C-alpha cells in the first residue's frame, strides 16, 4: 500500500512539474513530465487531462482527443473533465477537421469529397484563398458535380468576384436546371455587374421554380430599381413587404440598390 502511495505521490510531483513547464512554454519537457506521471499512476485523470492540453497546444489534435477521452473515462462524473473536452472541441474543431482532411488527401490525393470538405472547412475558418484552391481541385476531380461549383461561386460572391461566380453558376444551372438557389445567385451576380436583362432572365428561371420566395421578389425589386423601371420596382417591393415587412424594411436601410428611388413619394411611404 505504501508503495502505491509513493507512486501516486511521485506521479503528482511529475504532474506539478509538467504544469510549471507548460506555463513557461516548454511543451516538450512538459509532455515528458506528464507521461512520467501517467506511467507512475495510469489512473490519474488530471495527468491525462494536462497531457491533452499540451498536445492541443502542439496541434497534435488526435493525441489530444485520445488523452481527453481517457481522462473522461477515468472520471466520468467529473464536470471539469467534460468542460475541458468541450473547450478543446470548441476551440480546435475546425483545425482538427482540417488536419484530418489533409491526412485523407495525403493518403488519397484524388479524393474529391475530401478536397470539397476541406475547402468548406477552410471557408468556415476564414481562409478563403485556401478554400477556393480546394474547391477548384474538387471541381477538377468531379466536373459533373454542381455542388462544389455552387460553393465556389458563393465564396467568389462574398469576395465581390461576380464575374468568376457567373462562370461557375452558369455551369451549375446547366448541370442542375432545377436549382432555384443557383438561378437566384446568378441573377444577383448579373445585377451586380450591370447586366440587367441577363439578371431578369435568371430571376425568371428562379421564379418558375419558386415564385413566392421572399429573397427572389426583393431582388427583382432591387434589379428594377437599378434598371430605372420604377413601377416594376415598387410593385415587387410591395409584394416583398407584404410577406415580411420587418425583414424587408431592415434590408432596405442598408441596400444601395434602391438609391434611384430615394425621394420618390411612393417609395418613401413604403420604408
Give the ranges of each region predicted by the language model.
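TPR-adjacent "capping" and linker segments in tetratricopeptide-repeat scaffold/adaptor proteins
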Residues: 1-13
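Short coil loop/turn residues that delineate tetratricopeptide repeat
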Residues: 9, 43, 77, 110, ...
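Conserved alpha-helical positions within TPR/SEL1-like repeat arrays
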Residues: 12-23, 46-57, 80-90, 113-124, ...
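Conserved hydrophobic/aromatic "anchor" residues
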Residues: 14, 34, 48, 68, ...
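Structural signature of tandem alpha-helical TPR/SEL1-like repeats
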Residues: 23-36, 57-70, 89-103, 124-137, ...
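Alpha-helical protein-protein interaction modules
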Residues: 160, 164-167, 174-271
